[in-house]
Amino acid sequence: MTVLPTGLDTNSPEYAANRAALLEKLTELEAEHAKALAGGGEKYVARHRGRGKLPARERIELLVDPDTPFLELSPLAAWGSDYAVGASLITGIGVVEGVECLITANDPTVRGGASNPWTLKKALRANEIAFANRLPCISLVESGGADLPSQKEIFIPGGALFRDITRLSAAGIPTVAVVFGNSTAGGAYVPGMSDHAVMIRERSKVFLGGPPLVKMATGEESDDESLGGAEMHARTSGLADHFAVDEQDAIRQARRIVARFNWRKAHADPGPAEPPKYDEDELLGIVPGDLKVPFDPREVIARLVDGSDFDAFKPLYGTSLVTGWARLHGYPVGILANAQGVLFSEESQKAAQFIQLANQRDIPLLFLHNTTGYMVGKEYEQGGIIKHGAMMINAVANSKVPHLSVLMGASYGAGHYGMCGRAYDPRFLFAWPSSKSAVMGPQQLAGVLSVVARASSAAKGLPYDDEADAGLRAMVEQQIEAESLPMFLSGRLYDDGVIDPRDTRTVLGMCLSAIHTAPVEGARGGFGVFRM
């Protein structure tokens, strides 16, 4: 057993300053999460309850097994847009009758649960997670369909939702739809394409066209119940597989459906795991408020992995990247963590070899980001930084073992790609409130624009306006700073959530458990050409 030592001084001024800065960011984060939790606000929640209906989150609470956690995904979707934070949809992973399931629930207190462009992106991301990890899907449906004013952004890509349901079923991944209210127009295909559909007496309304549309199109007089009521679908159309008397009964029946899946995980759950030797609360004081100041990621690893036990790989080579093996909640993981921000040729080659080893051993990889990117300059260009960086990115792109990414600090430039950023399809990607991500840092980007503008003026023989340049740089820095912050990026679904660092071990443990529902198999020689 190789227990990581700690050099973290929790009594130092630096630790206190780091902790205070992160706690301030967590306070801001909690305020934004509260908006998602509030749904449509007190008025609309009260109206919903007044109709005898449960809020979406209470439906989920009844669905999942008692005293089991629910890992909510993308809670800040639509942050910074014209739509409500959360995008009128709740998604996450919960345990139902002992089975880990991907659960989605429309929030009818937000514009009747209507889908906007961010709702669609959030739902599609949930489907990706379900498919990659072979998680059965349960949809708690109550939606008026598409938000019509934004239909141009929803209609064409929105067809992928129904495609996904059928592909999940074809892959042998069960799908269940529980209809609590309206499921109209395109939304009618959610229960229609799911393996199992549960409907509620005098509540569920499932039809392609409601009475007004039918009247306009055919002249036929009809009402909700005869056209798409639960009893009609249970007795006449056959669309309803299960007929419930109320919401609680519908959820009970959904749980019984899952209990009869005869579902088995590809890998057995590991036994009890030893907790880290160090207090997870200390994670709050590790990342500096100024991301230009480096920190030792081993202090983070020591507070995440089982028993703080970590076997380093090539510890004396490419020291700006820490690599090694550990267990997290009993699951084996290979870890890559930035130590000094910049990636050089040595780090790139080290990473590529380590990723290949993980694929040989069928071990998932955890990437802990704090990088400004790959090194630039004449010496490094001549030394092959491009081909070595490409080697690392090649290895990440063609690796077949599951990847998990956590943005702790900076995640800039091609370093974001090499550390398995969103475009490289990590199974899950989370950010700490201390993180930032962009093509480069705000000051660097503003400086590059300034140099280019100055050179352009000189080439034309024109005087350069230094005052205007200072104003431009300040404006660009402010813009890039705002656009690199985690809430901005999370609002655009560039991560699966911004998390409290103290929750990281629990979140990663839940993700690893979900990942092991599906087979974990590495690439066997399936990498592209490595330039040597």
PLM features: what roles do these ranges have?
Residues 1-532:
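Ligand-binding clefts of soluble mixed alpha/beta catalytic domains
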